[in-house]
Amino acid sequence: MSQSFELVSQYKPQGDQPNAIRQLVAGINEGKKHQTLLGATGTGKTFTMSNVIQQVNKPTLVIAHNKTLAGQLYSEFKEFFPNNAVEYFVSYYDYYQPEAYVPQSDTYIEKDASINDEIDKLRHSATSALFERNDVIIVASVSCIYGLGSPEEYKELVCSLRTGMEIERNDLLRQLVDIQYDRNDVNFTRGTFRVRGDVVEIFPASRDEQCIRVEFFGDEIDRITEVDALTGEIKGERNHVAIFPASHFVTREEKLKRATKSIEAELEERLKELHDRGKLLEAQRLEQRTRYDLEMIHEMGFCSGIENYSRHLTLRKAGETPYTLLDFFPDDFLIIIDESHVTIPQIRAMYNGDQARKGVLVDHGFRLPSALDNRPLKFEEFEHKVHQAVFVSATPGPYELEHTPEMVEQIIRPTGLLDPVIEVRPIEGQIDDLIGEINERVAKNERVLVTTLTKKMAEDLTDYLKEVGIKVRYLHSEVKTLERIEIIRQLRLGTFNVLVGINLLREGLDIPEVSLVAILDADKEGFLRAERSLIQTIGRAARNANGYVIMYADRMTKSMQIAIDETKRRRSIQEEYNRKHGITPKTIEKRIPDVIKATAMVAEDGEEYTSHAPKQKMSKKEREAVIERMEAEMKEAAKTLNFERAAELRDLILELKAEG
């Protein structure tokens, strides 16, 4: 269905926005492959991009570098485009411990994961929308470059039903089973169907409230209705409905047979190779595991870890590019890479990290070499799939500078807000000085961000501020991804006034209430005090009319000087514009948006767990708190590839749960 994007907003483009929109749209229409929007913090980059999307009218993929940022962008685009398909596509794992082997200790760790059902639904909604309409915006994390099933297979297996269509009821049931729907007449949930006489009810994988009721008269479809899955209330009549597969990894039976033959051939070849090299243990291990998987595929149509055979299932050659979300888009689509200075390096690093882990599994006989082809895209493959891209950043990185020497600048804010004033103060007595500044802001009902260099300093500072009666929270790396949104929300609501953190950049902290950003140890050169990081951190105070930044330092580093000079340059351009147009700066008014349902279920307590499970008797509540903290540490350990620690924690958690 062809439909145009319809931007709904009470605002009109202002400041630098009209010029930025005009330049970007012209560049896209001229066929430019890469463009960069250098947009200062708070200049309304999302609104600019929304106007660009409306004018070029192409399906758009927006890539953010983490789930938190993707969640914020999803909420904003959904508000701007209420009548179009705005979708969300991130990794559906709440916890993911990849399969791994540690040769030093001869430890094999099985894959372990917990899937978030709400996010899985949103992923299905995203892919099905791309086949049903053109007016689609998908906000995704970098996980969109990981392998998915074949889009052709996915599209071919869509079950298309119309009123008056001749089809036997049992043929429809077989079709549904083929696309991985389960029959369940009792527990009716996403990805299932139930049968009552001549009525078949199907619960699509992309929905969580409404199902499709198909009524038969003999071998003909008599009526199709959309029904509330809980109450049974009819929501509307349908002449046609498309039921998309319940899994992105669907394969026809004949393809499955070809795949198993191909797996067997690879197994024989690999076993010969291992025997020739005298690796008998590895050969025995590989044969046992692969034969078991093949038997499961023969009997059940799938096996645990079937994605490791994806090259065979999609009939690809060794080393061939895997299918990803990008292949589900039509040829002429637009990619917007948000915070590109962070996102591009992340896309570049994905492949190497994945191959290092899988290479160990292959070498030691846990997987066939074809498992290496179940992977994210290499950076060159990603570049090849990009039709047209717009990089968006306040501090573009080397890749953007190389590919788009001429940048589209957006420095003027629609609200007239200026880049903050920066003051450098000595380190001696910095904490007492900071407390005085915090109290001044709290009295005006404003918020403060404090960034430190080490975890220890952040913890000590948080404890000290609490002791002197300041409402403060510490945002550390082990806070669950989706809990961060809730912490940011509480800061905005005034539940607490000061947020302390080490790397406050990655959160995408758009908080208009923040009037002071304090940077401790600003003169300690390194990633967190490099020019890009400093400019990004300074930008956190640019959404408030009283925005102010204090750098505590004993010397002026090159990075500090560049960041201060760039901020002054932008501020002078903004002041000149305000003077010319008679604008008085005013703080951004940004309502606290509704977030994705999956983000609402967050833990009450953000403390981190650092010790083993205590052996003494605990109450149920205490045990639950310990389990929650251990799970946070387990996820962090898996994320940093510390597989042994993650597996150890997983076992301790299972013990504690068993005791409960």
UniProtKB/Swiss-Prot annotation:
<feature type="domain" description="Helicase ATP-binding">
    <location>
        <begin position="26"/>
        <end position="413"/>
    </location>
</feature>
<dbReference type="InterPro" id="IPR024759">
    <property type="entry name" value="UvrB_YAD/RRR_dom"/>
</dbReference>
<keyword id="KW-0963">Cytoplasm</keyword>
<dbReference type="InterPro" id="IPR027417">
    <property type="entry name" value="P-loop_NTPase"/>
</dbReference>
<comment type="function">
    <text>The UvrABC repair system catalyzes the recognition and processing of DNA lesions. A damage recognition complex composed of 2 UvrA and 2 UvrB subunits scans DNA for abnormalities. Upon binding of the UvrA(2)B(2) complex to a putative damaged site, the DNA wraps around one UvrB monomer. DNA wrap is dependent on ATP binding by UvrB and probably causes local melting of the DNA helix, facilitating insertion of UvrB beta-hairpin between the DNA strands. Then UvrB probes one DNA strand for the presence of a lesion.</text>
</comment>
<comment type="subunit">
    <text>Forms a heterotetramer with UvrA during the search for lesions. Interacts with UvrC in an incision complex.</text>
</comment>
<dbReference type="InterPro" id="IPR041471">
    <property type="entry name" value="UvrB_inter"/>
</dbReference>
<feature type="binding site">
    <location>
        <begin position="39"/>
        <end position="46"/>
    </location>
    <ligand>
        <name>ATP</name>
    </ligand>
</feature>
<feature type="short sequence motif" description="Beta-hairpin">
    <location>
        <begin position="92"/>
        <end position="115"/>
    </location>
</feature>
<feature type="domain" description="UVR">
    <location>
        <begin position="624"/>
        <end position="659"/>
    </location>
</feature>
<dbReference type="GO" id="GO:0003677">
    <property type="term" value="F:DNA binding"/>
</dbReference>
<dbReference type="Pfam" id="PF04851">
    <property type="entry name" value="ResIII"/>
</dbReference>
<dbReference type="GO" id="GO:0006289">
    <property type="term" value="P:nucleotide-excision repair"/>
</dbReference>
<dbReference type="InterPro" id="IPR006935">
    <property type="entry name" value="Helicase/UvrB_N"/>
</dbReference>
<dbReference type="Pfam" id="PF17757">
    <property type="entry name" value="UvrB_inter"/>
</dbReference>
<protein>
    <recommendedName>
        <fullName>UvrABC system protein B</fullName>
    </recommendedName>
</protein>
<keyword id="KW-0234">DNA repair</keyword>
<dbReference type="InterPro" id="IPR001943">
    <property type="entry name" value="UVR_dom"/>
</dbReference>
<dbReference type="InterPro" id="IPR004807">
    <property type="entry name" value="UvrB"/>
</dbReference>
<keyword id="KW-0228">DNA excision</keyword>
<dbReference type="GO" id="GO:0009432">
    <property type="term" value="P:SOS response"/>
</dbReference>
<dbReference type="Pfam" id="PF02151">
    <property type="entry name" value="UVR"/>
</dbReference>
<keyword id="KW-0227">DNA damage</keyword>
<dbReference type="GO" id="GO:0016887">
    <property type="term" value="F:ATP hydrolysis activity"/>
</dbReference>
<dbReference type="Pfam" id="PF00271">
    <property type="entry name" value="Helicase_C"/>
</dbReference>
<dbReference type="InterPro" id="IPR001650">
    <property type="entry name" value="Helicase_C-like"/>
</dbReference>
<dbReference type="GO" id="GO:0009381">
    <property type="term" value="F:excinuclease ABC activity"/>
</dbReference>
<keyword id="KW-0742">SOS response</keyword>
<keyword id="KW-0067">ATP-binding</keyword>
<keyword id="KW-0547">Nucleotide-binding</keyword>
<dbReference type="GO" id="GO:0005524">
    <property type="term" value="F:ATP binding"/>
</dbReference>
<dbReference type="InterPro" id="IPR014001">
    <property type="entry name" value="Helicase_ATP-bd"/>
</dbReference>
<dbReference type="InterPro" id="IPR036876">
    <property type="entry name" value="UVR_dom_sf"/>
</dbReference>
<comment type="similarity">
    <text>Belongs to the UvrB family.</text>
</comment>
<dbReference type="GO" id="GO:0005737">
    <property type="term" value="C:cytoplasm"/>
</dbReference>
<feature type="domain" description="Helicase C-terminal">
    <location>
        <begin position="430"/>
        <end position="592"/>
    </location>
</feature>
<dbReference type="Pfam" id="PF12344">
    <property type="entry name" value="UvrB"/>
</dbReference>
<keyword id="KW-0267">Excision nuclease</keyword>
<dbReference type="GO" id="GO:0009380">
    <property type="term" value="C:excinuclease repair complex"/>
</dbReference>
